[in-house]
């Protein structure tokens, strides 16, 4: 306790920031912001852009903090997560709960004030889906945790779209579907090269419950499905040739990784595939944004 109290403000700030899983939060918020821009042919009002971004970030951070709290014993048993302040006991349970409550409350107020009630309630529902349904119920109980629980993690584009329009039309759900289908292969390649970690922690990830070969096959199958799903923005008319070209090229690389993992697996290859999957989603959504504003100029 004395060591906790004696830490510098900068160190404490870093520890609390770590609870929000900044890199994961950044990707989620990025997809939400893209959803905002795709929802309007012009520019997103600054009030909505700033308020929506801050509110979604705060509620996402609150959800990740609860995740760290619930999984602190599990995290302590895994090399990948043993460094987290919650796993090391550097932040107490009451402190994490208070931190999450403050972030969540400010985030909800920000969304209600600067966007609309629908965005606030959808984001709160996403918080519950991740922090409660996925973390408490699905992750420790079923190898399909990522498939089912991926619904909450796929919501950011819909949240961004709702922030601008007050509605969630079909095009927004296409973006949600892309992230939903992307989630299993993204996490399963991680679970493959971290399978010992998950096994030691007692988590029923797919490589632990069904074996490596089964997981490799499903990574390939889901990546094929993902390739098809990413064509939907073009087919629906939401996006044009710039996006289509990007989706095909990015998807071809992802498919190549999935095929190599299926045929000739190595932990090093899985690590590369995991890193690429993050780059893939970021570039795919960036392509949606570029296409959205380039399409009227290029006429394609």
From Swiss-Prot:
<dbReference type="InterPro" id="IPR006369">
    <property type="entry name" value="Protohaem_IX_farnesylTrfase"/>
</dbReference>
<feature type="transmembrane region" description="Helical">
    <location>
        <begin position="118"/>
        <end position="138"/>
    </location>
</feature>
<keyword id="KW-0812">Transmembrane</keyword>
<dbReference type="GO" id="GO:0008495">
    <property type="term" value="F:protoheme IX farnesyltransferase activity"/>
</dbReference>
<feature type="transmembrane region" description="Helical">
    <location>
        <begin position="146"/>
        <end position="166"/>
    </location>
</feature>
<feature type="transmembrane region" description="Helical">
    <location>
        <begin position="217"/>
        <end position="237"/>
    </location>
</feature>
<comment type="function">
    <text>Converts heme B (protoheme IX) to heme O by substitution of the vinyl group on carbon 2 of heme B porphyrin ring with a hydroxyethyl farnesyl side group.</text>
</comment>
<feature type="transmembrane region" description="Helical">
    <location>
        <begin position="24"/>
        <end position="44"/>
    </location>
</feature>
<feature type="transmembrane region" description="Helical">
    <location>
        <begin position="48"/>
        <end position="68"/>
    </location>
</feature>
<dbReference type="GO" id="GO:0005886">
    <property type="term" value="C:plasma membrane"/>
</dbReference>
<keyword id="KW-1133">Transmembrane helix</keyword>
<keyword id="KW-0472">Membrane</keyword>
<comment type="pathway">
    <text>Porphyrin-containing compound metabolism; heme O biosynthesis; heme O from protoheme: step 1/1.</text>
</comment>
<keyword id="KW-0808">Transferase</keyword>
<dbReference type="GO" id="GO:0048034">
    <property type="term" value="P:heme O biosynthetic process"/>
</dbReference>
<keyword id="KW-1003">Cell membrane</keyword>
<keyword id="KW-0350">Heme biosynthesis</keyword>
<feature type="transmembrane region" description="Helical">
    <location>
        <begin position="94"/>
        <end position="114"/>
    </location>
</feature>
<dbReference type="InterPro" id="IPR030470">
    <property type="entry name" value="UbiA_prenylTrfase_CS"/>
</dbReference>
<protein>
    <recommendedName>
        <fullName>Protoheme IX farnesyltransferase</fullName>
        <ecNumber>2.5.1.141</ecNumber>
    </recommendedName>
</protein>
<dbReference type="InterPro" id="IPR044878">
    <property type="entry name" value="UbiA_sf"/>
</dbReference>
<keyword id="KW-0997">Cell inner membrane</keyword>
<feature type="transmembrane region" description="Helical">
    <location>
        <begin position="239"/>
        <end position="259"/>
    </location>
</feature>
<dbReference type="Pfam" id="PF01040">
    <property type="entry name" value="UbiA"/>
</dbReference>
<dbReference type="InterPro" id="IPR000537">
    <property type="entry name" value="UbiA_prenyltransferase"/>
</dbReference>
<feature type="transmembrane region" description="Helical">
    <location>
        <begin position="278"/>
        <end position="298"/>
    </location>
</feature>
<feature type="transmembrane region" description="Helical">
    <location>
        <begin position="172"/>
        <end position="192"/>
    </location>
</feature>
<comment type="similarity">
    <text>Belongs to the UbiA prenyltransferase family. Protoheme IX farnesyltransferase subfamily.</text>
</comment>
């Amino acid at each position: 306790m004395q060591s906790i109290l004696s830490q510098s403000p900068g160190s404490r700030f870093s520890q609390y920031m770590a609870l929000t899983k900044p890199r994961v939060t950044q990707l989620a918020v990025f997809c939400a912001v893209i959803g905002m821009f795709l929802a309007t042919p012009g520019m997103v009002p600054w009030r909505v852009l700033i308020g929506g971004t801050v509110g979604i970030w705060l509620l996402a951070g609150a959800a990740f903090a609860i995740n760290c709290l619930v999984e602190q014993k599990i995290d302590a048993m895994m090399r990948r997560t043993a460094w987290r302040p919650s796993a090391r006991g550097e932040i107490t349970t009451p402190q994490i709960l208070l931190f999450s409550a403050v972030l969540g409350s400010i985030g909800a107020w920000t969304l209600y004030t600067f966007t609309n009630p629908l965005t606030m309630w959808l984001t709160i529902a996403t918080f519950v889906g991740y922090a409660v349904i996925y973390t408490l119920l699905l992750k420790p109980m079923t190898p399909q945790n990522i498939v089912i629980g991926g619904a909450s993690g796929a919501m950011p584009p819909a949240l961004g779209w709702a922030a601008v329009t007050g509605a969630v039309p079909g095009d927004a759900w296409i973006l949600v579907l892309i992230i939903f289908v992307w989630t299993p292969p993204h996490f399963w390649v991680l679970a493959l090269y971290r399978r010992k970690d998950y096994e030691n922690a007692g988590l029923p990830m797919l490589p632990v419950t069904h074996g490596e070969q089964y997981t490799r096959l499903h990574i390939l199958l889901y990546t094929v499905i993902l390739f098809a799903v990413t064509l939907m923005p073009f087919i629906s008319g939401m996006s044009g040739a710039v996006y289509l070209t990007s989706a095909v090229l990015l998807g071809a690389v992802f498919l190549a990784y999935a095929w190599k993992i299926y045929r000739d697996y190595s932990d090093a290859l899985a690590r590369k595939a995991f890193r690429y999957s993050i780059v893939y989603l970021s570039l795919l959504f960036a392509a949606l944004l570029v296409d959205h504003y380039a399409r009227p100029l290029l006429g394609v």
